[in-house]
């Protein structure tokens, strides 16, 4: 998003555009995409699998989408090229499910180090807490991965969003005329 437009953005900044204005336009555009995608996924999943906690599931979908979107925007803002940003973002998104613990339990030695960075874990773990009690108990019985309370999950996903936005601002603010 940013890495591919770096040369144009630098010219605009030279002409007087503030980094916050550029970031604001990106955040507005991407927020609309996050909302549309999250509502679509929620409608699709809730239609076929209504197991309770609809609003909670929607909020976790929105936060997970926003976290990944804004972290990838941050990567694009600090990357040297669009290719580098794309590759790093693909790896980040691609490793979310295997490292979340939702499919396979991670070794305890690795889990504590990796878990704070995996948005998919926080959305999944928090979303599980909103299931109907019989479904929640059934899921809990087959899981090897520990679940975290929903409030903690909301906070961590909010921190992911904030870190992505902060990295984006830092990357946009820094001049890179060598391009």
Which positions does each model-derived feature cover?
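Membrane-spanning alpha-helical segments of multipass transporters and channels
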Residues: 1-179
